[in-house]
Amino acid sequence: VAAGDPLLKEREPFGIFGAAHSLDRNPMDLPATTPTSVCGGADLTEQWDSGWDASSYLAAMDAQDITAAVLYPSVGLFVPFQADITHRAQADACAGYADWVAEYCATDPTRLAAVGIAPLGDAVLAADEARRAAALGLVGMLARPNLLHGRNLGDRFYDPLYDALEETGLVLAVHEGMGVRGGPTMGS
């Protein structure tokens, strides 16, 4: 958490486990219509009870015959789109995630890779974070396709980020979270 940024402190993540946040012991973001086969029929009780630490995640991959995975953030992907958090605090939160996920992947880097989060409020900070993520061994940077401060990802504002991605060889992974709201859509 960035010193002096109470708005970020208020949004500090914390774990909540319980029936209200699970569906038959699957993460809550799986819709009720998700078939059991999505997990290959694997019993993921151990992973749930372990809080999905890296070792239990690898065991779940083994149970489902998954060789390797690229990890994306969940709730963290929304950080760069909080308009009331300073750009520095957004970058600090993205850096914290990158540090954590790099350590998580270090459990078995032959099987686990990850993308960092681009703090898109400030393209220079995003470029700095891309270089840092590359140094940590991450394979890309995530950006949501939503408009931010009236800009889409094709805006020249983001050139410093794109230059850093080209320099480091990282990919830009564009991934929406819960659906684009309030922005332009195809055909509009």
Language-model features, listed with the residues they occupy:
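Helix-coil boundary/capping segments in enzymes
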Residues: V1-S188
